[in-house]
Regions:
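N-terminal leader/targeting and accessory segments in enzymes
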Residues: 1-86, 90
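Phosphate-binding loop of NTP-binding sites
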Residues: 84-171
Length: 171
């Protein structure tokens, strides 16, 4: 996807990105990196790591000053931290629009309830999957997320992969 299409801007009209990441360790060559850390030192360290891993563009909040020596383009995005999910959904084809998504909140038992919901909907004929602390994917085939709470980009990417694999319900 062209970065200009993702951001609805004329900036960098010809720059394609092949993925998005907001965790520098998950950047692959050709990705756009969403630098959303509110701590300057962390943000700079993560940007450096993302660029080393092949990020072709860095998205930062519009309050951030772009350094004149940046080795890849930086794009300032208004309210980036609150728009992460929106941008990731757009990039990955808005997967939740065509999935039945069941969210579970609370203090205790979220993982257990989500697993039970995925299991029950599977028994009722849905092609169900889970996303959360234990990973993502169909039950019995969960893939590790690398962290207990997936970020907005990871959620959208995982939902898109599950949808492409035939899943219709995600808990």
């Amino acid at each position: 996807m062209k970065i200009a299409e993702l951001l609805d801007t004329s900036t960098l009209k010809d720059l394609d990105i092949s993925g998005l990441a907001e965790h520098s360790g998950m950047v692959k060559p050709g990705y756009g990196f969403l630098a959303v850390s509110d701590k300057l030192w962390d943000r700079e360290k993560h940007i450096d790591q993302a660029v080393e891993r092949g990020a072709t563009v860095v998205l930062v909040d519009d309050s951030i000053t772009v350094p004149p020596t940046a080795s890849v383009p930086w794009v300032r995005v208004r309210n980036l931290s609150t728009r992460r999910g929106e941008l990731a959904a757009k990039f990955y084809g808005d997967p939740s629009r065509t999935l039945n998504c069941v969210g579970v909140t609370g203090t205790n038992g979220k993982t257990s309830i989500a697993i039970h919901v995925a299991d029950m909907t599977q028994l009722m004929g849905s092609t169900s999957a889970y996303i959360g602390t234990l990973g993502w994917g169909p039950l019995g085939q969960l893939q590790d997320l690398g962290m207990t709470t997936p970020n907005a980009v990871m959620i959208q990417k995982s939902l898109a992969r599950m949808r492409a694999g035939g899943t219709d319900t995600v808990a």
